[in-house]
Amino acid sequence: MNKTVSDFTVKLIGNNTVTADLASMVLNQTSTITGDGSLHLTSKRFFGLDMESASVTIDNTSLFVKGGYGIAGYIGAKSEVLTVRNSYVEAEGSGSGSISLISDLILEDCAITQPVGAEFDADQKAVVLNGELLKSKVVIEPITNSIGTVTADVPARKQGIYNLNGVKLTLQWNDLPAGIYIVDGVKRVKN
């Protein structure tokens, strides 16, 4: 697809589907798949997403891949690195691995959630479960490790400073230790 264009970006708008007999998408240079939409790649016999000597970043989007190989590099070369950043990814490679033949899998603000216990094995250059190459569906999902936005319509009698357990505190803001509090219905962090 992009043999001569490095830093290639696929921006997803809406729901997109590519179905092919061979590879659904081939990326030969450093590439990013991003956007508010989603992408469904299905290969009837070969690669869903072929990272041929390329590093690929899946950034803040949703990607669904199925094929004989799900998401795969060509030979697991050092340049074939898959980065998943705050994205939802489903990959299934019924013949040769769901996520395979890559030198590294970098997960930023996300984790492999299905199957439980699955992990990237650098020696096998693939996502495995109990040391076995996975050919069934692998799911990578965004993780949250903090409080997002707290929205509340706080009546006057409920205003004040609360801890995360919902207990109203009697100390003033300046007297509180460092931590996360809800002040008049708004999340505040005190350092």
Segments and roles (model prediction):
Residues 1-144:
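A composition-driven surface/loop motif
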